[in-house]
A protein has these predicted regions:
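Acidic anion/phosphate-binding donor-loop and adjacent secondary structure
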Residues: 11-13, 41, 56-72, 86
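Nucleotide-activated donor-binding/catalytic signature segment of Leloir-type glycosyltransferases, i.e.
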Residues: 104-131
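Short hydrophobic faces within alpha-helices
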Residues: 156-157, 164
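Donor nucleotide-sugar binding/catalytic pocket of nucleotide-sugar-dependent glycosyltransferases
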Residues: 27-41, 46-63
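Conserved catalytic-core segment of nucleotide-activated headgroup transferases in glycan assembly
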Residues: 70-114
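Short acidic/histidine- and often glycine-rich active-site loop of Leloir-type glycosyltransferases
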Residues: 168-181
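Membrane-proximal helix-turn-helix segments that form the acceptor-binding/catalytic region
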Residues: 7-29
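Acidic donor-binding loop of glycosyltransferase active sites
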Residues: 135-148, 161
Length: 181
């Protein structure tokens, strides 16, 4: 199962010899998005050796009746791999009447959003606490430089959040004009 964006794989397998050594003994590769499948094929894997599948979402995240009880719109931004932090900062700065919950993961973004009074930064949290933050949000904001199948995307959809996503990588395998801006 390959679950990294192509640029991350390029760092580990920058030359063809290394790539071939690591992949020769593998019968099938499963990817969580078409962009990663295409990348592996362009690196030399036969098409019949690569299978595109989809990211699962745990039933625990299914939110049958999302209820929004707050006055101002609340946006949650999760997932720090390949996040477009510059664009996220611009969006936050340009929307002072919107409340943002930004998941930092293992990074400390406090100096980055120091002047933004509309931002709540949360560190890496357990799933139950993350689910609660998602339940309190109206919108899942996913500004990314690239993506393949993402637990952030599928859990946001399951939670009934409105979706705003960068049109990159394999995002259209999960989100399109019918469910995402």
């Amino acid at each position: 199962m390959v679950h990294l964006v192509p640029s991350r794989l390029e760092k580990g397998f920058s030359d063809k010899k290394t790539f071939d050594e690591w992949t020769i003994c593998i019968d099938k590769f499963l990817t969580l998005g078409h962009s990663l499948t295409q990348f592996l094929i362009t690196k030399g894997l036969p098409e019949d050796k690569v299978v595109t599948t989809f990211h699962y979402v745990d039933e625990y995240y299914h939110n049958k009746r999302p209820v929004r009880l707050h006055k101002n719109i609340r946006v949650i931004a999760m997932g720090n791999q390949m996040r477009n932090l510059k664009l996220l900062k611009t969006i936050v700065d340009n929307n002072p009447n919107v409340n943002f919950t930004i998941c930092q993961g293992v990074n400390d973004l406090s100096s980055y959003f120091l002047k933004n009074t509309n931002v709540e930064l949360i560190p890496f949290v357990e799933e139950s606490e993350l689910r609660q933050h998602m339940a309190n949000a109206d919108i899942s904001l996913n500004v990314m430089e690239d993506t393949v199948g993402s637990n952030v995307i599928v859990t946001s959809l399951a939670m009934g959040l409105a979706m705003i996503c960068s049109n990159v990588g394999s995002i259209k395998d999960y989100c399109d004009d019918s469910n995402t801006i």
